[in-house]
């Protein structure tokens, strides 16, 4: 088995090294990751400039592009032999609830799924993560399960792991995505010439975080495993939209 590993924190991030070493115990691992931190890149694909990939001294390919670029390149042309699975992470910080929309970590896994491979996104749920080894151990267990019992073709796993030693993990929970309040306002500042600049504010606090959600699992010290899908269609709204269309004049 060949596993393509990527992330959005960059090829020198601690989480990707620990993950690659752990997965190397069960598979051949190839790392293709951004050359710098690309957190929040979401599913952006570089179309206006060429991509450059360089094999580093640590054996990792670093790409001047987004996490999605890395996985796309790794599957469709960079490697002599196509991988069997994509694992993205271990992310520095959680990807809970609405975070998945912005996450380059999740997008890297989703790109693997777009291109026909099973995929997992793994995040360590702490702003000051320490226990990357715990998250890597969880990923290795899930890789084995996923190969033995594949998910539906449009599905990936979004995995969040408490920042705890392995022995303190209380459980593994199948969860749904929770939701956050709206983001905090942008932070206004000034450049050295006094011109206004803005920093994107922090994510909102959890709002929908009750039992069954990814937020709740992490708060309990459990690993949260959320199956998420490529199809963004809101099926419950189709009939309502169809009703609108019946009332829209055709001329």
Swiss-Prot record:
This entry's comment on the bound cofactor is: Binds 1 divalent metal cation per subunit.
Keywords linked to the UniProt accession: Cytoplasm, Hydrolase, Metal-binding, Nucleotide-binding
| InterPro entries given in the database record | SurE (IPR030048), SurE-like_Pase/nucleotidase (IPR002828), SurE-like_sf (IPR036523)
Give GO cellular component annotations, separated by semicolons: cytoplasm
Q: Which cofactor does it need?
A: a divalent metal cation
Which catalytic reaction applies to this protein?
Answer: a ribonucleoside 5'-phosphate + H2O = a ribonucleoside + phosphate
* NCBIfam families in the record: PRK00346.1-3, PRK00346.1-4, surE
Q: Which family does it belong to?
A: Belongs to the SurE nucleotidase family.
Q: What is the protein named?
A: 5'-nucleotidase SurE
Q: Which organism is it from?
A: Nitrosococcus oceani (strain ATCC 19707 / BCRC 17464 / JCM 30415 / NCIMB 11848 / C-107)
């Amino acid at each position: 088995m060949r596993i393509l590993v990527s992330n959005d924190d960059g090829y020198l991030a601690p989480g990707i090294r620990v993950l690659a070493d752990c997965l190397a115990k069960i598979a051949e691992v190839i790392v293709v990751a951004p050359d710098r931190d690309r957190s929040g890149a979401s599913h952006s694909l570089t179309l206006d400039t060429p991509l450059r990939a360089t094999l580093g001294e640590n054996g990792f390919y670093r790409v001047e592009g987004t996490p999605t670029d890395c996985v796309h390149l790794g599957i469709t042309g960079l490697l002599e032999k196509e991988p069997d699975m994509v694992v993205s992470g271990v992310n520095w910080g959680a990807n809970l609830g609405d975070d998945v929309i912005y996450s380059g970590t999740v997008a890297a896994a989703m790109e693997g799924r777009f291109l026909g491979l099973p995929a997992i996104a793994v995040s360590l749920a702490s702003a000051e993560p320490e226990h990357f080894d715990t998250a890597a151990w969880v990923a290795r267990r899930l890789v084995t399960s996923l190969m033995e019992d594949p998910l539906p073709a449009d599905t990936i796993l979004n995995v969040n792991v408490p920042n705890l030693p392995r022995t303190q993990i209380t459980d593994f929970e199948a969860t749904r995505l929770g939701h956050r309040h709206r983001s905090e306002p942008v932070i206004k500042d000034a450049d050295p010439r006094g011109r206004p600049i803005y920093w994107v504010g922090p994510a909102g606090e959890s709002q929908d975080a009750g039992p069954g959600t990814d937020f709740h699992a992490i708060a309990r010290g459990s690993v949260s495993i959320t199956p998420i899908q490529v199809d963004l269609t809101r099926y419950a709204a189709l009939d309502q939209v169809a009703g609108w269309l019946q009332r829209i004049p055709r001329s």
